[in-house]
């Protein structure tokens, strides 16, 4: 039987969008065996608690979600003194000081412990699944990211495919087979250049579920064939559920 992975990111407290994606997953012709959520389950909204509860209680016919931390989760942990830095600098720079209290009030303490328990990312088969990259959750990879930076993010974990969600975009960025030459220059000498063979690899942006009202995007992946499908689900009053597919071999 042909099994797929469903990979999504950025629910951002939007329960209706998450439900629309789950319903679309159930309608797929091929069964979805694994469900990965690459962070930003929450945002600074009280509805985030309902999303967490829904993730914690999958229905009998649904795959159990595997969830890792995203940018919003990291900001929440920082506020509670559980993050890797002491101050919510990024949160304040992006949204202002008022957002500190808004995020604090949105997520009850008992759910902070659930957020704290989440992994930083997953490595399955030859795939790294993570919100940003192995550098940080804030590392935003896009189709415009320089190739050498993309290659660095892949080679840090020796992954053939890196699935990420920080940008919110759906994209496939392929790196062809080749050679990378590097050298080290010190004050007194130059070390001979070293050549490293690079095999074909790719970075995949998995989309964003909850940011745009009425439209959710996510990714289906077939590990055996390396096939990728980008899915767009339109939902809401008067729309029912509509799905737009983009298949990439």
Language model regions located:
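Beta-strand-turn-beta hairpins that frame and shape the catalytic cleft
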Residues: 1-6, 122-128, 197-203
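Acidic, His/Gly-rich catalytic cores of divalent-metal-dependent hydrolytic chemistry
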Residues: 174-249
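Short, basic, glycine/proline-bearing loop/turn elements
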Residues: 35-41, 98-99, 132-138
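Active-site neighborhood of divalent metal-dependent phosphoester bond hydrolases
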Residues: 45, 52, 57-124, 145-155
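N-terminal active-site segment of His-dependent metallophosphoesterases
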Residues: 1-54, 58-61
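Active-site neighborhood of phospho(di)ester-bond hydrolases with catalytic His/Asp-centered motifs
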Residues: 8-9, 35-40, 66-71, 130, ...
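Active-site environment of divalent metal-dependent phosphoester hydrolases
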Residues: 12-17, 43-46, 72-77, 135-137, ...
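His/acidic metal-ligating clusters that form di-metal
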Residues: 28-31, 104-176, 180
């Amino acid at each position: 039987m042909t099994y797929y992975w469903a990979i999504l990111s950025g629910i951002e407290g939007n329960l209706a969008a998450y439900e629309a994606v789950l319903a679309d997953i159930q309608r797929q012709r091929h069964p979805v065996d694994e469900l990965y959520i690459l962070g930003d389950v929450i945002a600074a909204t009280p509805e985030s608690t309902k999303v967490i509860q829904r993730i914690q209680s999958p229905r009998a016919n649904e795959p159990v979600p595997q969830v890792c931390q995203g940018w919003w989760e990291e900001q929440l942990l920082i506020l509670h003194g559980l993050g890797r830095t002491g101050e919510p600098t990024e949160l304040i720079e992006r949204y202002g000081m008022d957002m500190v209290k808004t995020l604090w009030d949105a997520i009850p303490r008992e759910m902070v412990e659930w957020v704290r328990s989440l992994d930083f990312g997953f490595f399955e088969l030859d795939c790294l699944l993570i919100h940003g990259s192995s550098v940080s959750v804030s590392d935003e990879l896009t189709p415009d990211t320089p190739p050498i930076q993309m290659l660095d993010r892949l080679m840090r974990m020796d992954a053939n495919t890196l699935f990420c969600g920080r940008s919110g975009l759906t994209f496939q960025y392929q790196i062809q087979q080749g050679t990378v030459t590097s050298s080290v220059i010190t004050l007194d000498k130059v070390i001979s250049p070293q050549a490293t063979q690079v095999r074909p690899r790719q970075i995949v942006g998995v989309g964003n579920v909850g940011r745009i009202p009425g439209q959710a995007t996510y990714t289906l992946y077939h590990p055996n064939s390396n096939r990728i499908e980008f899915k767009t689900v339109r939902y809401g009053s008067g729309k029912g559920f509509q799905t737009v597919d983009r298949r990439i071999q």
